[in-house]
UniProtKB/Swiss-Prot annotation:
GO CC field: cytoplasm; microtubule cytoskeleton
Protein name: Serine-rich coiled-coil domain-containing protein 2
Compartments reported by the entry: Cytoplasm, Cytoskeleton
Biased composition (Basic residues): 606-615
Main localization (coarse): cytoplasm
Keyword Cytoplasm appears in the UniProt entry: yes
Residues bearing PTM Phosphoserine: S222, S451
Domain of life assignment: Eukaryota
GO molecular function terms attached to this record: microtubule binding
Alphabetical keyword list: Coiled coil, Cytoplasm, Cytoskeleton, Phosphoprotein
Record keyword Membrane present: no
Amino acid sequence: MEEKTQIKTFLGSKLPKYGMKSVRSTLQPMPNGATVTLLGTSKSSNVKSYIKNNGSDCSLSHSFNWRKTNKYQLGSQNTAELNNIQSTHDKLIEPEQHAPAPGTLDGHGIKGGLKSASLFTSKLARPSTMFVSSAEELSQKSFSGPSNLGKFTKGTLLGRTSYSSVNAKSHLNAFYGNRSSGNVQKPRVNSCASRSSSGESLAQSPDNAKSITCEKMVRSQSFSHSIQNVFLPPSSITRSHSFNRAVDLTKPYQNQQLPVRVPLRSGMLTRSSLQSEVLNGNEHVGFGFNRPYAAAGKKLALSNGPAVSSTLVYRMAHPPLLKSSRPPFSGPMTVDSNKNPPADMCVEEEGMVSAQDSSPGKDQELIENESYRRDNDQTGKNESKVRYLSDDVDDISLSSLSSSDKNDLSEDFSDDFIDLEDSNRTRITPEEMTLKEEKHESRPSKDIFDSPKESEQAFSKAEEWIDISVSDRSECTKHTSGNNLISPDTDYRAGSSFELSPSDSSDGTYMWDEEGLEPIGSVHPVGSYESSEMNSIDILNNLESCDLEDDDLMLDVDLPEDAPLENVECDNMNRFDRTDRNVRQSQDGFWKRPPQRWSGQDHYHLSHPGHYHHHGQSDLSRGSPYRESPLGHFESYGGTPFFQAQKMFVDVPDNTVILDEMTLRHMVQDCTAVKTQLLKLKRLLHQHDGSGSLHDVQLSLPSSPEPEDGDQIYKNEDLLNEITQLKEEIKKKDEKIQLLEQQLATRCNCQQKSKEEKCTYADKYTQTPWRRIPGGYCAPSFSPWQGSFQGMPRTVPPHRRQTSSTTAFQQPSQIYRPRPGKTNKATTYRGPQ
């Protein structure tokens, strides 16, 4: 398994189109000139041995030189092939280490190869069915320009981490991270490598390797979860997050830490080896290599690390299924998934540089990160996972960042992405990337997060990622402190780009890039949770944590009239908007028009169980199932008509008062019942009046079968009568038939009798002359005839002669009647005599 995990391919910058080539090419040399090799190799010894500091060759099991020629179908390669490739890359590493990577960016000084390397590092995975464009193409597309690079730096577009938290489902196009057993992690949007639970090593299971294949598919921020680390435990992905903030996706629930894809740094390599060793401990190695945080100047070393830890601890202690929290890493690259995507880019850039800077510093970072992660693990269930989640965040594919750049990483654009991603990660703008590139080694404490405060806020957001819709880091902080603090509802975050991935039809481009549309992501990728029940329970529990009153949650049947229009409008619209977004995301493939930004309370209104339950189960039974469960739409990926109806509400003006579906249904049912009753009464009146307008009434009451029933009764009676008559007729006919048959039989008998009589007469006639002849004389002559023709003994003829006048003679003739032929012959013969 280790080898398989080592073979994890890295996804490239722009989200590769589905069905594209895998990016399993060697990384380009690091900006320092060192060739970045995959840290994903489970062989920590190799990683450590190859790790070198500034400018030194990092000869990992795989050197990452982005080559367009090296394109692999993730799904097509076997683990053995991966191992072979890995060994081959190891061989190639030394010559390639010093060769500049073709994908390097001059403007930012960050080489696309490095980013690709980090991408690959995070995404070392056994090839899966998913295809990833070659790392070079990804790097070129994502990093085609320094400005793009900076933008991409925000979430390392090189790769997005698919979140192994989702289990086998992660093998889907990473829309849904793999479910990890038990722990649910949000797939990191920007992280190429999913982080496996600390208890699992990168190579621990072939399932993880399989999930890595999904991870290999690095899409733009649209679906960070699309890339799933094979290394991630099945619980790694709770839901995908927008790629602007990979943290939300990257943030697994507190228990789930996605191994952070470390920029190709010696520290990273060392950490990856350490993490692969420590995976079961506090550290997770997404690909056997962790991001060296020291190299990044401890980019994530937040000044308020303890606060972040507390937040992480809270998250880990309370990892809502819908929200993925990852603790800031005390280590240099402690980057939350939200910030890590940029951090990942920076980490790759800075991390590679810093990895080149000093492996001992990286080792220290690893140690710090490990200790911090251990602390986090103690504090939170899987802080190490969270720590590594930050790497996944960094792994955001450049294309996704570029997509966000196209739409502008402004708050409006990135809110959706960040809402899902930014819980722990601050979006890194190209400026930040540039600064980070400049400060690869100069920035010791500041991570990709713009500030510790920001990262701290991001962490708090991670707790309540749902409401973290801030495209700007400051916004993230605002949302985090404000409505975004709605951790229970965080899961209901309005759709964000993280779940959205370039559609096949869009040719790998993001719709929001093309049309300015923002993908609406739900809190978690559909199917990311082990069970819908679990999700619902967790969400409900989280929702309960919010201090919302029934009045705030939902409209009663009378609420539209009683409640102020403002409240009603806000509550209803927000509710519908959130629900609609979530539903639309699940129903429509995650691509929606840019969703309206919601406040945390709006989310509460949307998802709070009070909305659904305070009316009473009777209403719920009549109402749509969605009301019964805030996650109903998530649980059943297909949207109900109610959800579809809610979609219409999105465009409704804010001042419009909307009735909830249950109320409408009740009203409709009541109206229908009243109408039916009225029609029945009318029909009855007509019947009593004796007016023959029953048919008219019946026509007016097509829904009520009773009028038809009356007619049917009459018709049935008529039919029965007809049937009875027919039966009688049939009986009569049968009797006639029998009589006729009897008559026919009788006629036949009469004819036979007449024939017999005729024959008898003939016999008598023929015998008359014999009377004239003495019997003695005639006996000899007649006996032959009798004997020959009638077979009678010769003695009979004399007897016959004597009794010729008696009937006894006729009886014998009749007895011989069965032989009419002979008798006829005799008669014929006798006639002449």
